[in-house]
């Protein structure tokens, strides 16, 4: 079966130990059909000569893990966007467009094994009190986002606080949300700190080919504070207003009223 084909069958057959921790040494995501049968997974990737000592320190509690996944681990290989064109005809096709990585899985509303940005710690963190410096911003404005992070566990730890932006205007085809910034903080047990993000126009923009520049459409945007791309802790809304006028592109379906609207 799948478990045996991936080298873990003997562990379950022999019932060596119910409390099994799997340490992954890999360069990219792998299928993990055995995930629900183990107590924990430590993803160390390809760390180099100090991997063994660092792994032991984490497993025995001398160090507290704080890393986050820089990629999505899918449920199975066939869930990946590249699967549809593999192995290809001596060339690779990248058909995802702007829906690369977690953006693809979000758009497809697809369940994943572990989401982009995921990573556990031996302590826990509480997110609270999100505050925006304004409810509306323009192209030249800076939006300040404050959020309070509290270490609610019993040991010191580090958390990577992630900020995603979701364009709710519907003006262009865009991902459900996009990572725009992240900040790593260290907290002692019971300690709390305010994390501050500063967002400019680029945080709300996409590249508009007709304009030949980054363009932030008029409309509402969700500011999402998260522990991972699938673990949104806090959300606030802001309105963006732009004075930039896009070039008018006429087609055979353009009506006279659209010409008049653009001229005005």
PLM regions and their residue ranges:
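Intrinsic-disorder/low-complexity, polar/charged segments enriched in Ser/Thr/Lys/Arg/Asp/Glu/Gln
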Residues: 142-144, 192-196, 233
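Short acidic, flexible loop segments centered on an aromatic residue
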Residues: 154-171, 177-179
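Intrinsically disordered, low-complexity Pro/Gly/Ser/Thr-rich segments with frequent PxxP/GP/PP motifs
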Residues: 171-209
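Short, contiguous acidic/charged loop-to-helix segments that flank catalytic cores in large enzymes
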Residues: 5, 45-47, 135-138, 181-188, ...
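A short helix->loop->beta-strand "cap" motif at the edges of active sites that frequently abuts
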Residues: 16-20, 38-39
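Secreted, periplasmic, or luminal enzymes acting at the cell surface/secretory milieu
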Residues: 25-158, 164, 189, 218, ...
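Terminal connector regions
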Residues: 201-248
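Single conserved hydrophobic/aromatic residue that forms the stacking wall/gate
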Residues: 1-12
């Amino acid at each position: 079966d799948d478990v045996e084909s991936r080298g873990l069958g003997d562990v379950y057959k022999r019932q060596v130990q119910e409390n099994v921790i799997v340490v992954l040494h890999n360069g990219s995501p792998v299928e993990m059909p055995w995930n629900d049968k183990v107590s924990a997974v430590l993803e160390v990737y390809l760390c180099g000569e100090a991997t063994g000592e660092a792994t032991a320190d984490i497993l025995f509690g001398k160090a507290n893990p704080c890393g986050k996944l820089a990629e999505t681990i899918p449920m199975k290989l066939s869930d990946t966007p590249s699967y549809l064109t593999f192995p290809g005809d001596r060339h690779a096709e990248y058909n995802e467009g702007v829906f690369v990585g977690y953006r693809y899985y979000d758009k497809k509303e697809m369940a994943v094994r572990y989401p982009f940005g995921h990573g556990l710690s031996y302590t826990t963190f509480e997110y609270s009190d999100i505050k925006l410096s304004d409810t509306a911003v323009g192209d030249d404005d800076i939006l300040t986002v404050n959020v309070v992070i509290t270490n609610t566990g019993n040991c010191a730890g580090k958390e990577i606080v992630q900020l995603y932006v979701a364009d709710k205007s519907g003006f262009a085809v865009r991902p459900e949300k996009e990572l725009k910034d992240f900040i790593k903080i260290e907290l002692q047990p019971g300690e709390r700190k305010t994390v501050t993000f500063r967002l400019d126009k680029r945080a709300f923009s996409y590249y508009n080919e007709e304009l030949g520049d980054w363009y932030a459409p008029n409309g509402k945007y969700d500011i999402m504070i998260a522990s991972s791309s699938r673990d949104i802790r806090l959300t606030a809304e802001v309105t963006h207003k732009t004075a930039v006028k896009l070039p008018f592109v006429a087609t055979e379906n353009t009506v006279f009223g659209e010409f008049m609207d653009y001229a005005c």
